[in-house]
C-alpha cells in the first residue's frame, strides 16, 4: 500500500491497532529513545544492568524472533502481522505495518513500509524496551535509590498485566487453518494461586539479592530467565538447569501389585503444559530383569491436547494437569521384572511435525525426571 509519509503511516497503524484485541497490538508504539540511553538495544541496557542482560540473552524471550519454529510458521501465510506483536512487540521492530484489512480478512492485510524499521532491534525479539519503554520513558517496578535515568514507577511490573498481553490470547478465525489458544492467564485465574497473592512474576521471575546495576547496592531484584519448560530454542543456548525447575512433581514406588506412580502439577500456576497446543509432557515406565534385558511393554501417560488443523482447527481432547492437580497410577509388573525406570520429559512438538517443517536439529524435548525403583 502506498505510504502517506512516516507520521501519517504511524497514525494509521496506531488507529488500526486500536481497533484490534489487545493481543493483536504491539506493546510499545513509540520510537523515542529514553533519556540516559544510547539506543533502544538490549546491549545499551546491558552496559549497566549486566547480570539481567546476561540472563535475558539466553532466554526464550531473546530468541522469540530467530526461533526456527516461529520462522516457518510466519512464512505460511500473510497473517504474520498477528504474530509479530508478541514476538517483536515494538513497532520499530516491524518492517511493515498493517493499516487495514481487505474484506476484514486477517490474511489480506493492507501494509505500509516502516521507514523507522530497525532490523537489529527486531533480531532481539522480546527485548528490554518491549516491557520497559513506553513513549520514550523507562518504566519499572520502583526499586528506590537514584537511577542515572528517569524511571516511571509502574505497578504492572509487580502484577500479571504485562505478561497477559501475550500469554492470554484466544481467538478463532472462521474458515482459517490456524487459531490462537494461549489461555495461560485464564488457567492461572481459575486456579489456587491468585488467592495466595501469587502471579506470573512470583514464579517466572524469582527474587535474587544483588545489585540491579553495576555499582548499585545489593537489593531484591527479579531474575530475567523467565522459567519455563527448559526446551532450548537454539541448541546449546539456554539458562542453567536451576532456572527451569520442572512443573511436574513425580514419585514412584515398587509395590506388590505394581509400580505406583504419582504425578502432580506441583510448580506451574497454570495447566501443565500451557501455551502452544502442540506441547505435551509424558511419563514412561520401562522394566528390566536381573540381566538388564527389557521385559514387558513400556507404559506411557501423556499430558497434553489433541488437535486436528484441517479443514479448520478442532480440539479433540485435553489431558493436561490443572494447577496442583495430582493423578495416581498402578503399572502392572511384567513377569521377570526386577527394576523399573521412570522417565518424564517435556516436548515442544512431535518428530513428525518437525520433519514436516524441515526443522532438522531443532530441540524438541528435554528430560525432567529419571527414577529407578526396585522391590
Residue spans for each PLM region:
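Short, aromatic- and glycine-rich surface loops/edge beta-strands on solvent-exposed regions
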Residues: 283-285, 337-346
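Short glycine-enriched loop/turn motifs at secondary-structure junctions
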Residues: 38-40
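Active-site neighborhood of thiol-dependent amide/isopeptide-bond enzymes
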Residues: 81-84
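Long, hydrophobic/aromatic-enriched structural stretches that serve as scaffold segments
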Residues: 86-89
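Primarily the internal scaffold of c-type cytochrome electron-transfer domains
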Residues: 2-36, 55-78, 92-322, 328-333, ...
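A long-range scaffold signal marking pre-active-site subdomains of enzyme folds
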Residues: 42, 50-54
